Regions:
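Metallocofactor- and cofactor-centric catalytic cores in central/energy metabolism, strongly enriched
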Residues: 10
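Alpha/beta enzyme core
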Residues: 1-7, 17-156, 164-191
Length: 191
């Protein structure tokens, strides 16, 4: 939280258990508290994700990043996945933006496009590449695919594996407008 304040980062991404403490540390700053819902595997039920969203917001979360249920998606339960996104969006909106985490490295191109379309249909604010928990990384190819799939109806957050200014700039140029990285200070300093 202190580094985010010092460097003016947009948000600090944390688990719901730490939202209240982070909100206290960031009170009076422009740095937002971003709660990871369904983290890390997205396998919680819709009911739990909605409850987690409401609880995080009540404790001071100003943004919500929800992990989709990748297993349900892989099983072809598209209606379930889209409904889950809609329910989390409904719990958060209109005051708290929602980012839908795809776990891009686990999905086919067709599945990535499908989830992006679900996020748009559910009126999510962003689609996001990865949690950083399961491996993988944000790639230029994924950002370009996601940008085409959302067609300007959602913003894009690149997250995971962004270690250098060069990688950051490549993803920015591809269409990402927000970034999740543990290397923010190095990137800001141009390293």
């Amino acid at each position: 939280c202190e580094e985010a304040k010092e460097y003016g980062f947009a948000a600090v991404a944390i688990t719901p258990a730490n939202v209240k403490y982070a909100a206290q540390l960031l009170e009076g700053t422009n740095v937002k508290v971003e709660a990871a819902i369904g983290f890390p595997l997205g396998s919680s039920t819709t009911f739990i994700k909605v409850a987690e969203t409401k609880d995080a917001i009540a404790n001071g979360a100003q943004e919500v990043d929800m992990v989709i249920n990748v297993g349900a998606l892989k099983d072809g339960l598209y209606e379930y996945v889209e409904n889950e996104i809609k329910e989390v969006v409904k719990a958060a909106h209109p005051s708290v933006p929602v980012k839908v985490i795809l776990e891009t490295f686990l999905l086919t191109e067709e599945e990535k496009v499908k989830v992006c379309q679900m996020a748009v249909n559910a009126q999510a604010d962003y689609v996001k590449t990865c949690t950083g928990f399961n491996g993988g990384k944000a790639t230029k190819e994924d950002i370009l695919l996601m940008k085409k799939a959302v067609d300007g109806k959602c913003k894009i957050k690149a997250s995971t594996g962004i270690k250098s200014r060069e990688e950051f700039e490549e993803l920015l140029e591809a269409g990402a407008v927000r970034f999740g990285t543990s290397s923010g200070i190095l990137i800001v300093n141009g390293d």
